[in-house]
């Protein structure tokens, strides 16, 4: 189970990092090189997601969505210095429970 978690985290870092670089370019006036690097990192995110061991695209992306939410809240705390409120935390917990429900059962 460590490999899928590693892939989810790596994909999340690429999606959030790439998206943030594009945000900096388009919203905060950074150079187009920053945006280009963000685009390349976002492309890597799409490739990294295919390394998951789960056979179903839809299930992988649905489960990844829960991981993405948690990582986005952590990013907001570390980079934007915005602490999640109780509703953010409750929502994130609900999402992680959903991810576990999707991924943990053995399907025959």
From Swiss-Prot:
Belongs to the UPF0060 family. It comes from Staphylococcus aureus (strain MRSA252). Keywords: Cell membrane, Membrane, Transmembrane, Transmembrane helix. It is a multi-pass membrane protein. It is found in: Cell membrane. This is UPF0060 membrane protein SAR2425. InterPro entries: UPF0060 (IPR003844). Pfam families: UPF0060. The keyword ATP-binding does not apply. It comes from the Bacteria. The chain crosses the membrane at residues 5-25, 31-51, 60-80, 86-106. Its main location: membrane. Disulfide bonds: none annotated. GO terms for cellular component: plasma membrane.
């Amino acid at each position: 189970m460590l490999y899928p978690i590693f892939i989810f985290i790596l994909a999340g870092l690429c999606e959030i990092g790439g998206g943030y670089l594009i945000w900096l370019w388009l919203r905060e006036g950074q150079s187009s090189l920053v945006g280009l690097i963000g685009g390349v990192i976002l492309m890597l995110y799409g490739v990294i997601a295919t390394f998951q061991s789960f056979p179903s695209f839809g299930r992988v992306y649905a489960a990844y969505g829960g991981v993405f939410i948690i990582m986005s809240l952590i990013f907001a705390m570390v980079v934007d210095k915005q602490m999640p409120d109780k509703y953010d935390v409750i929502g994130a917990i609900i999402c992680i429970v959903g991810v576990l429900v999707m991924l943990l059962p053995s399907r025959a």
